[in-house]
């Protein structure tokens, strides 16, 4: 019996056909790993600094740029318009990000860290990179380099598949 819709229709007591082991399915394993890694990193900025993941991503992008277009930050951070809007509103309330109209695009905004935002970014960055270092310490230097290569290859392949449906 092939795996598919027909395999879902079995007589009572009939043994299942070939099984699909979700725990061995690479996308599932990557998602679980990403959740675990993100949760350990998030402990720093959520618990200690009352930031959400989306807020941290915005701060992290702005931390490496003097200023950026809001839509570019959102695209780079993987945030949709609603996520970006909510996170920016809170960062603005906390006076961590300055928002000004984009002179080139009247519909857009330019973002930059405030002094408080820069100070917070400077506090958080060494803490999250220390956690990253701890996680990567489980790998040899060759394994870490291979992981970077594998991630890049899988990302390119996924984007190609996504583009072609």
Predicted regions span which residues?
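Positions in alpha-helical segments
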Residues: 28, 57, 130-134
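Flexible interhelical turns and helix-capping residues at alpha-helix boundaries
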Residues: 30, 34, 38, 49, ...
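Charged, amphipathic alpha-helical coiled-coil/dimerization segments
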Residues: 6-12, 76, 89-152
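A short alpha/beta connector and helix-capping loop motif
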Residues: 157-163
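N-terminal leader segment of winged-helix/HTH proteins
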Residues: 1-49
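N-terminal helix-turn-helix DNA-binding core of bacterial DNA-binding proteins
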Residues: 21, 39-83, 88, 163-165
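Short amphipathic alpha-helical elements of helix-turn-helix/winged-helix folds
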Residues: 61-65, 150, 157
